[in-house]
């Protein structure tokens, strides 16, 4: 099945996402793949989401300049891979973040396992099969979707480094709120809630 439009965003999207992650992580490795441009939104989303389950690991072809600097500063776990053969042998499923099509991953994905796509782009060129799930919300950055998911289903994952990764993704994709949607301010509040992070001190 090919979706020509993203599904309408509503809270049950995150319910479905949580159920999908729980089910697939219970039976094997679930790599969280970035878009091949390696920008801060895709990398921040992947590392933050992967931190919520020991069977997930953030992977991708490339770290962009900002992503590399932020990951080195935070000692954030990210595995560089060149193709699908570098993925774990016992795969349960794959998650792809911040990519509007499979071509944006940079290599062919395995056909025989479920996939989850989490994205904020209006365009969608994914072909979905049984067992796949597609989450798309009209926000400025994919890290906003990940922040809502973690705050609701895995609040213990919202450590200071994870919050900084989420913020970095939001700030870069929104141009530090210069071309953001109103929802981005709410997302920033979710990320900063009960933390000692000073937004003005986040340099990217």
How would you name each of these model-derived features?
Residues 1-37, 45-53, 126-202:
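A structured phosphate/pyrophosphate-recognition subdomain
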Residues 52-63, 81-89, 104-110, 179-192:
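Short, Lys/Arg-enriched charge-dense amphipathic segments
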Residues 56-58, 115, 166:
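Hydrophobic/aromatic residues located in beta-strands of well-ordered beta-sheets
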